């Protein structure tokens, strides 16, 4: 652009207060860009939008009894249980928090450990051996040895630049409606084809009566090509119509999502919806709904350590099941830790039971219709490469009407684009029903 001519005249020096405001605004802008680790796409943000964002953050970030700084930059607020975001939900105004479900799945009991996970859930010495057993994964914020006090729950603090990475304030913390299918066969699983979401999953029949599911999931840190793509490995517990607007879904696992978290670390996550991802539900604790009860596990916090090729393998065990007496859907982590629950009031179809369970991986390919993304699923290696290279789900189980855990013997598998990501299932004694899955995305067979 050319220079702009100005009229001659005398210019008065700006008042000191004006200079101070300019410095503050510039400092805020600089800190936003740097702290987001280049994942926040800076753009001009109006004062009204910033005010709306701040009001939203004030609702999510409750006053903390104690604040813990994680080595990875996260801030963990220890919030009193009765002050957590879940209880802001209009259906939960008079909700009484359960400490533990009155009845556990019968195969293996769990217990509420306010002091954390058992030693069996974290084995630093675990390695690739003949028995193919993985070691449990922990969370990075535990490394500084500080813990939330009893009576509080750890909640990852949300910052302004976390919201700025989303398309809008409404979209923040939610799955995009564009990921929903317009039509689906009656017996098809909850997958999305042709719009950028790709899967490699195992699933049960659509007509089964299911009251929960469990699996142990290998943890990796797959590479993500662009900020608006993600890679996750999770369990889906589903009920309702796949073709309508009443699908109920409860989900949990690990996820790498630069847009949601601002980095490329694998993180423990949850999700729920009661209306096919339209208006209800969210990731983690980014809206009212999920009630956390444990003081050691922070949903949305980074998992550590992670697996590496041909070396130590680490995994997490996720259990989701319905309390047969009160109807709440509980989440267990590891062998013996209750994390919290989704109250029955949140759901329609899941207030009764689930009709399908899925286990597996999902990625977003933002280049749909063009060159395929190089975003990896699982470890970034194909299923046939096996233990130590390919990612796995092992010991797939479901909870039946008697509140008993049993191994899943009959599953179907699906990979929409097996040249990019695939899946291979099997069965043996130590791992029960299990499968390897994943892939590198873009490669000579997946251009």
Model regions: which residues?
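Exposed, interaction-prone regions of secreted/extracellular proteins
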Residues: 2-447
């Amino acid at each position: 652009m050319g220079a702009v001519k100005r009229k001659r005249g005398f210019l008065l020096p700006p008042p000191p207060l004006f200079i101070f405001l300019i410095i503050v605004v510039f400092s805020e802008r600089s800190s936003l860009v740097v702290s987001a680790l280049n994942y926040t796409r800076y753009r001009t943000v109006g004062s009204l939008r910033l005010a709306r964002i701040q009001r939203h953050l004030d609702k999510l970030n409750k006053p903390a009894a104690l604040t813990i700084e994680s080595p990875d930059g996260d801030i963990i607020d220890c919030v009193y249980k009765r002050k957590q975001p879940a209880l802001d939900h209009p259906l939960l105004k008079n909700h009484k928090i359960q400490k533990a479900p009155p009845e556990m799945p019968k195969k293996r009991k769990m217990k509420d450990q306010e002091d954390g996970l058992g030693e069996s859930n974290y084995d630093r010495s675990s390695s690739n051996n003949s028995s193919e057993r993985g070691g449990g994964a922990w969370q990075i914020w535990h490394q500084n040895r500080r813990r939330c006090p009893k009576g509080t729950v750890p909640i990852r603090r949300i910052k302004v630049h976390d919201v700025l990475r989303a398309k809008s304030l409404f979209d923040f913390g939610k799955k995009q409606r564009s990921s929903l299918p317009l039509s689906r066969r009656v017996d098809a699983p909850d997958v999305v084809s042709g719009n950028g979401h790709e899967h490699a999953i195992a699933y049960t029949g659509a007509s089964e009566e299911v009251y929960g599911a469990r699996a142990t999931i290998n943890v990796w840190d797959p590479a993500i090509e662009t900020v608006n793509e993600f890679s996750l490995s999770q369990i889906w517990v589903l009920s309702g119509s796949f073709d309508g607007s009443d699908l109920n879904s409860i989900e949990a696992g690990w996820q790498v999502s630069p847009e949601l978290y601002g980095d490329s670390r694998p993180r423990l996550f949850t999700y729920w919806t009661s209306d096919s991802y339209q208006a209800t539900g969210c990731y983690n604790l980014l809206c009212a709904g999920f009630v956390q009860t444990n003081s050691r596990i922070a949903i949305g916090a980074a998992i550590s350590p992670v697996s590496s090729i041909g070396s130590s393998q680490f995994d997490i065990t996720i259990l989701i099941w319905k309390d047969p007496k009160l109807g709440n859907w509980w989440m267990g982590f590891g062998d013996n830790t209750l994390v919290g629950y989704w109250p029955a009031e949140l759901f329609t179809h899941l207030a009764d039971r689930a009709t399908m369970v899925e286990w597996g991986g999902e990625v977003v390919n933002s280049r749909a219709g063009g060159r395929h993304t190089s975003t990896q699923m699982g470890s970034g290696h194909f299923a046939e490469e096996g233990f130590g290279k390919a990612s796995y789900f092992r010991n797939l189980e479901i909870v039946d009407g008697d509140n008993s855990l049993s191994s899943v013997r009959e599953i179907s598998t699906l990979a929409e684009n097996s040249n990019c990501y695939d899946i291979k299932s099997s069965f043996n004694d130590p791992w029960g029903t299990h499968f390897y899955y994943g892939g590198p995305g873009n490669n000579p067979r997946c251009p």
